[in-house]
């Protein structure tokens, strides 16, 4: 159930000053940052990000800049904050642009390419339980 008691008749976009007060500033050129999250506004070198636990749903037509304007800055802020990442990247764009940066920062990059399985890494979800079973540890397998 939604609690709508905080909603007023006035609905508007936040001003730049309000955004700067509310969100965390991230400088992509520094090695470490205070926050990681989805960019609300960005100049390219810096951004104000929503580092709350809120979910984000990004919608846009093909070629509208979802990857370049939202996902790339989000990924970079997570790298700078040393966050763990699982990235769904069906076209391989983020992998293509961020792979070297991730490795440079010490990330282990695993690529599961379901379109071309021989090209990427492989993952067998039954491998670990199979090893446990073969060792006689059937209760954990």
Residue ranges and their predicted role:
Residues 1-34:
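Charged, amphipathic alpha-helical linker segments immediately N-terminal to NTP-binding catalytic cores
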